Design a protein with these regions (language model features):
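Non-heme Fe(II) oxygenase catalytic core, chiefly the N-lobe of the double-stranded beta-helix
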Residues: 2-259
């Protein structure tokens, strides 16, 4: 009977990106992690917001087991692209099978959003594992860009902070922006019933670090409670544009074997 390899206790290597967020963590996630090592990973995640574990060789079970250490796993509402036998894993892909059908969600990340902000209790984090990465002329494609909305909030003019204090934006999954001709399947009536409008504070306090962040995107926020639409929609657009200023961004360039967590 094989015995799982157990890592020895050493400080984990964390290399920060030259950006407003992001870091690489040098840990082999296929090994059994002690509670102390996991605590270091968790702290690095909280400090850097987006973390990447390079050169991973994970089974589906290992991917799920590591993810579960951060909390209860969710099943994505788009059931069509759940990995058979592993419903905790959603396939992201633009590859088509022999019948010409997409094998995964092809437009994920095409617009700015915060995962599952349309739920009453949004996800704590997401973990995306790169099994294949497209290339053209030797250059990897499909970069993913992230925004540090903590830094964005902290840099807001004082007048804007006062304007949004105590306000709640209305998130609507069915209004998420789509690229023209998006192949994403439309939600059924039952799925729409699962995702009613949800209001979250525009300035959201992180439950683990206590830091304040902007929590609003033009991609799926349709209004602000108690504010007329002719004022709310421009304000949402203004905050959205502020969050994605270059000084708040990190661009992740994918490699096969990356496990990216945000």
């Amino acid at each position: 009977m094989a015995v799982p390899a157990i890592e020895t206790k050493m400080p984990i290597p964390v290399t920060r990106a030259d950006a407003a967020l992001g870091a690489e963590i040098g840990v082999d996630l296929s090994r059994t992690l002690s509670d102390d090592t996991f605590a270091e990973i968790e702290a690095a995640f909280h400090d850097n917001i987006v973390v990447c574990f390079r050169r991973q060789t994970l089974t589906n079970e290992q991917h799920i087991d590591f993810s579960r250490r951060f909390g209860e796993l969710e099943i994505h509402i788009v059931k069509k692209y759940l990995l058979p036998g592993y419903p905790e894993i959603l396939l992201i892909s633009n590859v088509r099978n022999e019948a010409g059908e997409l094998i995964g969600l092809a437009d994920a990340g095409f617009t700015w959003h915060s995962d599952t902000s349309y739920r009453q209790f949004p996800s704590r984090c997401s973990l995306l594992y790169a099994k294949e990465v497209p290339h053209r002329d030797g250059v990897a494609l499909g970069d993913t860009v992230f925004a540090n909305t903590i830094a964005a909030y902290e840099a807001l003019p004082a007048a804007t902070k006062r304007r949004i204090e105590g306000r709640r934006a209305i998130h609507r999954y069915s209004e998420r922006r789509r690229v023209p001709g998006s192949p994403r399947p439309k939600l059924t009536a039952a799925q729409l019933a699962e995702t009613p409008d949800i209001a979250h504070p525009i300035v959201r306090t992180h439950p683990y670090t206590g830091r304040k962040a902007l929590y609003v995107t033009a991609g799926e926020c349709v209004g602000i409670e108690g504010v007329p639409d002719n004022e709310a929609v421009p304000l949402i657009a203004e905050l959205d544009a502020w969050c994605v200023r270059p000084e708040f961004l990190y661009r992740h360039r994918w490699q096969v074997g990356d496990l990216l967590m945000w």
